[in-house]
Amino acid sequence: LPRDEKRLLPAAPCCPNCGGSLSYLGEDTAEQLELMRSAFRVIRTVREKHACTQCDAIVQAPAPSRPIERGIAGPGLLARVLTSKYAEHTPLYRQSEIYGRQGVELSRSLLSGWVDACCRLLSPLEEALHGYVMTDGKLHADDTPVQVLLP
């Protein structure tokens, strides 16, 4: 898969403890799978480590936040999985097959775990929306059925 690399450097070019100069010590890397315009890309984040030449302090940029802690899915890919499942009514087994044809093997259980994690992340929004909807005296709903094909 193609890879994009983002380099994160420490905020200051000098040691935050003593003000001494920093020397390159190494780096930590983390990869995240992302879906961009229906094409998968791996976003590789490299966080360089620097050591102070005077006090041996190690300085490194903080890791960027992820929607799912230590997960490989980026926000665009998670949005695509949820949109396919809930707006386009594409079951997870079919999504798994589609992604497999694009060269990325994502099991149904992995996709299901992502959906569960996203539901937990979105629960405060759901609660706020529920509270807002229930403030009115009337509630209207569309009961148009959606046909689902059996697998």
Predicted regions and their residues:
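Short, flexible loop/hinge motifs at secondary-structure junctions
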Residues: 1-72, 140-141, 147
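Gly/Pro-rich turn-and-neighbor structural signature
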Residues: 9-12, 16-19, 88, 93-151
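Conserved catalytic alpha/beta cores of large enzymes that bind or transform nucleotide phosphates
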Residues: 64, 82-84, 96
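Generic alpha-helical structural element
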Residues: 4-7, 41, 70, 84, ...
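Short, amphipathic alpha-helical "recognition" segments used to contact nucleic acids or chromatin
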Residues: 74-88
